[in-house]
Amino acid sequence: NLLGSFSYCGDGSVIRFRKISRMKLTANITLDELTKSQIAERKGINNNPGPQQIENLKALAVNILQPIRSHYNKPLIISSGFRCAQLCTEIGSSINSQHVADNGAAAADFEIPGVDNRELALYVKRELEFDQLILEFYRDNEPTSGWIHCSYSTEANRNQSLRAFREDGKVNYKPWLE
């Protein structure tokens, strides 16, 4: 049981002990990888997920992250996984982001060093069931540019594929049809 190793405070916050932060969600993905945030640490923000959020993060790890890790046999660099609402506000993200891991879904931003991010996104698109896949800020002439955003829903996956790009100083999204 994932939830048995946590202590829950009366206010609903979670106390995570050092050994728990290394809790394995899959053979190669830990809870710590999905919750670590330099901004949260710097600002003193408690970025610990609650019980349902942990279950959603585990579903993301089992159905998206571990299959990628196993296919490429290389570690993923997760730049952003779980974000509590306070952290989302701090970085200018929506508190409705799937990174908050509520409503049966969770998301992560990641890449694999040495693997073309377009190739990585195509693998996810062709081989895995996902809710949303975004190839973010990838430049065709720079294979390691940008990163992948991918979410997984335990309820209903849309298999929505997008590409994010900057135009006139704004972030835009368009369907990714490859």
Where do the protein language model's features map onto the residues?
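Glycine-rich, flexible loop/turn motifs
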Residues: 25, 87, 96
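Extracytoplasmic cell-surface/polysaccharide-interacting catalytic and binding patches
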Residues: 17-71, 165-178
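Single, functionally critical "micro-switch" positions that shape active/binding sites
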Residues: 22, 83, 98
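Catalytic cores and adjacent binding grooves of peptidoglycan-active enzymes
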Residues: 98, 102-106, 112-178
